[in-house]
Amino acid sequence: MEKIQQAYLYMLKVEKQFSEHTLKSYHDDLEQFNVFLAQEHLDLNAFEYKDARNYLSYLYSKNLKRTSVSRKISTLRSFYEYWMTQDEAVVNPFIQLVHPKKEHYLPHFFYEEEMEALFDTVENDAKKGLRDRVILELLYSTGIRVSELVHIKEQDIDMTSPGVKVLGKGGKERFIPFGEFCKQSMERYLASFKPKLNSNHDYLLVNMKGDPITERGVRYVLNDVVKRTAGVTEIHPHKLRHTFATHMLNQGADLRTVQSLLGHVNLSTTGRYTHVTNEQLRKVYLNAHPRAKKEN
């Protein structure tokens, strides 16, 4: 990998504070671009708009989803913009390249009874249930990203006005409240689970060795919980974020509030969560339409 590409990734890590998962995606996008350059005997310094169009065709030939292609093009556009700030790249060959239209999809989420089943599973785990419950509670009760979760320190938790302070994308800080269930789980965890592991750091969540838990560790915990929960087959941290947003909106929270809680810059990003379940649609219809119910 070229030095300028390494410098770009370092900037994303240090200045933008991107998560490990996001950094890996950017790294892989650049590596795939480098493979194309080598195959086509092209020079990074002499890459032009026509070459960018050819690269777009190359990506489509790999049968990638439009969302994946769009992200890879965004990575390279951003990389060249960074390069130009270093007074090395003269032009950005991707600046005029039209983004492929993204596929529209409804975010997957859990129903409330599925969430209760997950909580029942961790409640019955005597060994590590207290820790796993806090992970579930924080992800579901606050909608935070897994990258934000693993960086929470004990001093970021406020038990007086229950909530947590997190550092989001771009180093932006926000405070998210949580309820009594989450508060009680946190108190039990801090009182009886974490002290037994003799942790010599102030990160909130730990693995079974007492070290700060990683994003991979959180995913492992969630997958383990799902394996032991009847009727639930798939889970990932972002699905809990989707669930938080969906349940908040279905219960009447306004879009701007949810945007603020999620840490979204654009309201349109939050807007995709305005899908509702069929049960919610029927509930609203029955309560709102004058001819939905027949008087006896």
Swiss-Prot record:
Location in the cell: Cytoplasm
Main location: cytoplasm
Positions of the catalytic residues: R145, K169, H238, R241, H264, Y273 (o-(3'-phospho-dna)-tyrosine intermediate)
Record InterPro entries: CB, DNA_brk_join_enz, Integrase-like_cat_sf, Integrase_catalytic, Integrase_recombinase_N, Integrase_SAM-like_N, Recomb_XerC, Tyrosine_recombinase_XerC/XerD
Tyr recombinase domain ranges (all copies): 105-286
Protein purpose: Site-specific tyrosine recombinase, which acts by catalyzing the cutting and rejoining of the recombining DNA molecules. The XerC-XerD complex is essential to convert dimers of the bacterial chromosome into monomers to permit their segregation at cell division. It also contributes to the segregational stability of plasmids.
Family: Belongs to the 'phage' integrase family. XerC subfamily.
Record's subunit section: Forms a cyclic heterotetrameric complex composed of two molecules of XerC and two molecules of XerD.
Record protein name field: Tyrosine recombinase XerC
Provenance organism: Staphylococcus saprophyticus subsp. saprophyticus (strain ATCC 15305 / DSM 20229 / NCIMB 8711 / NCTC 7292 / S-41)
